């Protein structure tokens, strides 16, 4: 369902340069690791959902025994597979809303941890409950799910953002805003989506996602976000 759109995105974006959210893993995964690290200890398999071209997956491969990077875009997975990556990291094309694909992962790998950065806010509202159930099915009894997502009203935030953001050229501002989703996710939606008997949202709160767009003083533009950590009680 989502593969066609994202494949077109990667075909276009990677001909012109990196997407705004492509930042070094040290500025993304490593910061998130402070939250999910202790919860990912029961199983050594990590599913990196929305892996894109695989930089996050490769970084996770240095922390865990087995990492599977999944993305709906065949072009992104093609780039990831062609890159230099460790033998404990593999890449697959797959759609979170595809129950058969998700069941296949469960059969192949059993309980797993899930790292998901900036994906849920791109899922259509009617599909989100189904996707949340698929994710809980994958973590099973021993795994955990960490997600960090673009916050609500994100475009309005940047249209009224700090003076530093508005000092950027107008064309850059508009390009940045046009790449953001119209609606984000908030903590209450995360709590509702993953409210299933036996599972607990143990940590949640506000955060930010780094981008590779720099302000005039050299600091990166940050996107307000929310995070959640879910596991079996």
Task: Describe the function of each predicted region.
Residues 115:
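A conserved beta-strand element that flanks and buttresses the S-adenosyl-L-methionine
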Residues 137-139:
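Conserved helix-to-beta-strand junction in the class I
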Residues 119:
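Hydrophobic adenine-recognition pocket in adenosine-nucleotide-binding enzymes
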Residues 1-107, 123-127, 134, 144-233:
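Class I (Rossmann-like) S-adenosyl-L-methionine-dependent methyltransferase catalytic domain
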């Amino acid at each position: 369902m989502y593969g066609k759109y994202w494949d077109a995105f990667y075909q276009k974006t990677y001909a012109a340069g990196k997407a705004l959210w492509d930042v070094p893993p040290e500025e993304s995964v490593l910061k998130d690791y402070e939250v999910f690290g202790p919860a990912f200890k029961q199983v050594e398999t990590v599913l990196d959902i929305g892996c894109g071209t695989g930089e996050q997956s490769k970084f996770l491969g240095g922390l865990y025994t087995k990492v599977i990077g999944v993305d709906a875009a065949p072009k992104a997975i093609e780039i990831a597979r062609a890159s230099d990556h460790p033998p404990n990291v593999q890449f697959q094309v797959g759609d979170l809303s595809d129950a058969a694909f998700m069941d296949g992962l469960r059969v192949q790998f059993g309980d797993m941890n899930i790292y998901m950065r900036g994906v849920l806010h791109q899922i259509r509202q009617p599909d989100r409950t189904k996707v949340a159930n698929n994710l809980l099915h994958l973590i099973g009894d021993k795994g955990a799910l960490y997600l960090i997502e673009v916050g609500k009203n994100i475009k309005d935030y940047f249209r009224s953002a700090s003076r530093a953001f508005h000092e950027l050229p107008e064309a850059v501002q508009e390009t940045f805003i046009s790449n953001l989703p119209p609606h984000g996710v908030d903590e209450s939606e995360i709590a509702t989506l993953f409210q299933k008997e036996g599972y607990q949202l143990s940590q949640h709160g506000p955060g930010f996602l780094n981008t590779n767009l720099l302000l005039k003083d050299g600091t990166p533009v940050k996107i307000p976000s929310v995070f959640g950590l879910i596991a079996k009680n």
